[in-house]
């Protein structure tokens, strides 16, 4: 992918946007101070971002939403309320909403051996007697691992991919006993969903989740209308897509979704694809494109006990199952990989964050935000979806690329990055009691 050079018109657009961002008040805006604070973070020479889209909810209502930076740097196009992002692993939470809809319809059972859905045996070779369930897959306790890959093309079935077991299983921990975050879990989940519904994953999620909640976007950009795919944010890093040094003072380089002037290309041979063969094709793990505003609709539904627009989308019982911890870290006898303290409790497709100040997954410096949700990171994007169901508060953060390598800018008070900490701590002012 070519370097994205910032020409003079684009540079002028960036400067104009910095001013415009502060003069575009959102719902119940808490004042221009937060606008200026977030604009300064976005344009910081070290922590700076290609684009930023945020939304906060307070007491069950949208309190603040704003966009900063450019969705397409080369074309000089600003991020807008309609701009969609490839939200990375927050997609897993949305995929889980689809799973729970199928559970409520009686098509899936969280505790049945998933082999019965897949049509082939899904077993850890080290523990062949132990069935694997959807509950294990959704809570990352299945013993699946990503070392052998977690995404394959249309021409490869999941059955074929799983025949080579190297790197795909944990030989030391029995399924259900140990947590280790793995994308492959949700590739299997997507395949199961297709198998029981007889429908391609992208279309199934449109029918189960996106259409009922009146959301734009989807898991397949090539199927979107022009007005949607042209508003997908290009994701950037200040390094080549696959290798090379990360230089904060250099040009932004497009990584994925460079659709400002070129339409998304349909997946090769997709018309011959058989649903249930390989759900990884549409990336249930991270491939959803959606705006912060539409993620806000999902969050409001979850804060309203599964109701949206006066109708039931999910039952309160289903949401409780999703958010209730299925796994908790036990320091006395380690039962999971916490990823440097970031993961300590998981439900089904939902993480429980620490509310105490100074803990690994604490989202704000002051502590006190008792939240559940999901994080995401891929191709330069950093994303946060977090809500407090008791106080009915929440925050959504979509960062379209960071000037510095996040690995070199670790957080000061958590296992998050410094970029995420800066935005979350500032945004929390719009939801804090």
Predicted regions located by residue number:
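Bacterial N-terminal signal peptides that target proteins for export
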Residues: 2-11
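Sec-dependent N-terminal signal peptides
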Residues: 12-17
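C-terminal motif of bacterial Sec signal peptides marking the signal peptidase cleavage site
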Residues: 20-21
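Short, conserved catalytic-motif segment at the N-terminal edge
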Residues: 31-85, 159-160, 166-168
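Short active-site loop at a secondary-structure junction
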Residues: 45-53, 74-136, 171-184, 283-286, ...
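Short, surface-exposed loop or secondary-structure junction motifs
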Residues: 125-369
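Short, gly/Ser/Thr-rich active-site loops of penicillin-recognizing serine hydrolases
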Residues: 323-335, 355, 365-367, 400-433
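Short, well-ordered beta-strand elements
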Residues: 382-387, 392-408
């Amino acid at each position: 992918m070519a370097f994205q050079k910032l020409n003079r018109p684009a540079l002028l657009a960036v400067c104009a946007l910095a001013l415009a961002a502060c003069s575009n008040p959102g719902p119940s805006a808490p004042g221009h101070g937060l606008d200026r604070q977030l604009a300064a973070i976005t344009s910081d020479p070290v922590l700076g971002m290609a684009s930023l889209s945020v939304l906060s909810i307070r007491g069950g209502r949208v309190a603040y939403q704003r966009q900063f930076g450019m969705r397409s740097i080369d074309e000089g196009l600003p991020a807008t309320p309609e701009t969609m992002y490839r939200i990375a692993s927050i997609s897993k939470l949305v995929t889980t909403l689809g799973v729970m809809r199928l559970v409520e319809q009686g098509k899936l059972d969280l505790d049945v051996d998933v082999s019965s859905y897949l049509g082939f045996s899904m077993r850890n070779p080290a523990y062949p007697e132990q069935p694997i369930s959807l509950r294990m897959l959704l809570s990352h306790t299945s013993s699946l691992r990503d070392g052998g890959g977690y995404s394959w093309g249309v021409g490869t079935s999941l059955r074929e991919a799983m025949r080579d077991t190297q790197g795909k299983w944990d030989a030391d921990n029995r399924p259900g006993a140990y947590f280790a975050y793995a994308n492959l879990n949700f590739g299997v989940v997507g395949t199961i969903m297709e198998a029981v519904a007889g429908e391609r994953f992208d279309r199934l999620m449109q029918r189960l989740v996106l259409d009922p909640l009146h959301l734009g976007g989807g898991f397949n950009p090539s199927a979107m209308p022009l007005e949607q795919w042209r508003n997908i944010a290009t994701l950037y890093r200040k390094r080549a897509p696959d290798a090379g040094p990360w230089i904060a003072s250099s040009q932004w380089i497009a990584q994925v979704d460079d659709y400002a002037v070129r339409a998304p290309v349909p997946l090769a041979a997709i018309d011959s694809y058989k649903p249930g063969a390989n759900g990884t094709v549409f990336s249930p793990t991270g491939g959803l494109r959606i705006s912060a505003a539409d993620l806000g609709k999902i969050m409001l539904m979850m804060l309203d006990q599964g109701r949206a627009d006066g109708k039931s989308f999910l039952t309160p019982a289903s949401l409780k199952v999703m958010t209730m911890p299925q796994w908790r870290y036990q320091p006395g006898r380690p039962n999971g990989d916490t990823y440097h303290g970031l993961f300590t409790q998981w439900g089904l497709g939902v993480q429980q964050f620490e509310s105490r100040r100074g803990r690994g997954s604490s989202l704000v410096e002051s502590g006190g935000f008792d939240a559940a949700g999901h994080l995401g990171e891929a191709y330069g994007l950093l994303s946060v979806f977090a809500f407090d169901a008791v106080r009915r508060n929440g925050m959504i953060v979509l960062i379209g690329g960071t000037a510095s390598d996040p690995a070199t800018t670790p957080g000061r008070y958590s296992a998050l990055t410094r970029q995420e900490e800066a935005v979350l701590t500032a945004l929390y002012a719009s939801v804090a009691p």
